[in-house]
Amino acid sequence: MAAKDVKFGNDARVKMLRGVNVLADAVKVTLGPKGRNVVLDKSFGAPTITKDGVSVAREIELEDKFENMGAQMVKEVASKANDAAGDGTTTATVLAQAIVNEGLKAVAAGMNPMDLKRGIDKAVLAAVEELKALSVPCSDSKAIAQVGTISANSDETVGKLIAEVDKVGKEGVITVEDGTGLEDELDVVEGMQFDRGYLSPYFINKPDTGAVELESPFILLADKKISNIREMLPVLEAVAKAGKPLVIIAEDVEGEALATLVVNTMRGIVKVAAVKAPGFGDRRKAMLQDIATLTGGTVISEEIGMELEKATLEDLGQAKRVVINKDTTTIIDGVGEESAIQGRVAQIRKQIEEATSDYDREKLQERVAKVAGGVAVIKVGAATEVEMKEKKARVDDALHATRAAVEEGVVAGGGVALVRVAAKLAGLTGQNEDQNVGIKVALRAMEAPLRQIVSNAGEEPSVVANNVKAGDGNYGYNAATEEYGNMIDFGILDPTKVTRSALQYAASVAGLMITTECMVTDLPKSDAPDLGAAGGMGGMGGMGGMM
């Protein structure tokens, strides 16, 4: 086992604090509308330019192992805030730095660290309740656009784009992709879309678009390969009599069956299109069941004793329209019952809660979106790859922030909400004097985000903080325009969830750091002695010394 280097008391805390400050100072320059960029070197390719706090934090590793431990603990604050709310990472880092610095000063002055931590925890619990009381619902697209704009570093075009995304609803899946031009674009897919196209180009009935478009078709869902046309004849005859088109979604349609369907389509006997079912294995079975729920049909599966020959029109699903191209199939307005669809969504949600891997969770979330919401794709436009990466990170932050805003509402932005909360809790007391100091440490730290935003804007933090504290309600300082007023009227909003998560995670990790008394790390390995000069002729295995 490697030898360890151990530091105690003030020695340990000073080293840890240095690491905290290095990381936090690098991250906090990005805060606010006038925050600066940070350039991150990459081992290959162009450097990354970012204004995203967590991206900066993730890049920082310090040479001194004790300092690095402090930096890594603050990195954890940023990561946790990012995981919980998808934004607010810089605010969380600034809060953590403020609590650690103030807290360690109190420890150095002789306060009991455990009581300090209890005081901080008490203040944060009370602050979370106050934040909830200040929160107002965020439902209209104007407020959503404002939240998106603030989170995307005051980029109004991104804010407006994200406000349009509410077309896919709360359950919708939103993906961010590289665009092809300089402008940002938004594609919204109505209905259920999956990534499987037609099995034969002969099904195409819209040559100008290269797509198959079928109005009010029946939809046959089969969890098996179909190669024998005899199995399908009863269904095909029933569909032909009904005078409607047919879409077949099966594990595969091949050989004689596919050839016969193509011939029937080309002769105009019955309009048919066949596609492979999406997914593989158990996921394919589940997705077929999703489509069945959406279209009011039944999956023909031999596992439950159903045979294709005995299928009737009652077993088929229906939709208002189906569009199939080379790579995708979109089912629009399935006729499934709303209660059945909601039941299916609830079932998938339960699976999301029980899922252990991020991959499974993501795939299940996509299924919820396809059944209940829709899919929106934001295509980010930029002139260079470096700009594209930076912009995608901002769009991603804005997306998470707007989701958080819809979930828990919004509070006044620009650090004002935390200043108001701190003022309301000024009379809060603990069980002893040391806990009272802990409460004051937390309340003083709540001013740090406002002070940092002002500092990044080139103004004097103390002057602005005092002016803001002299006001009440949503009165604050707009760093972008350098004027005071109602932050809600200015359109400067923060999602309550983002502010709450930032405060909770910052206090949690900072409290642990304040109560640290000892740090242990591996001693750096001393270089092994150079054995290249030892006796022995090359290739003689050390026998040279025997001659």
UniProtKB/Swiss-Prot annotation:
Residues that coordinate or bind ATP: 30-33, 51, 87-91, 414, 478-480, 494
Keyword RNA-binding: no
Highest taxon listed in the record's lineage: Bacteria
GO biological process: protein refolding
PROSITE patterns, per database record: CHAPERONINS_CPN60
GO molecular function: ATP binding; ATP-dependent protein folding chaperone; isomerase activity; unfolded protein binding
Record InterPro entries: Chaperonin_Cpn60_CS (IPR018370), Cpn60/GroEL (IPR001844), Cpn60/GroEL/TCP-1 (IPR002423), GroEL-like_apical_dom_sf (IPR027409), GROEL-like_equatorial_sf (IPR027413), TCP-1-like_intermed_sf (IPR027410)
Keyword Nucleotide-binding: yes
Catalytic reactions on record: ATP + H2O + a folded polypeptide = ADP + phosphate + an unfolded polypeptide
Main subcellular location: cytoplasm
Compartment annotation: Cytoplasm
Listed GO CC annotations: cytoplasm
Function: Together with its co-chaperonin GroES, plays an essential role in assisting protein folding. The GroEL-GroES system forms a nano-cage that allows encapsulation of the non-native substrate proteins and provides a physical environment optimized to promote and accelerate protein folding.
Family: Belongs to the chaperonin (HSP60) family.
Complexes and interactors: Forms a cylinder of 14 subunits composed of two heptameric rings stacked back-to-back. Interacts with the co-chaperonin GroES.
Record protein name field: Chaperonin GroEL
Organism listed in the record: Klebsiella pneumoniae
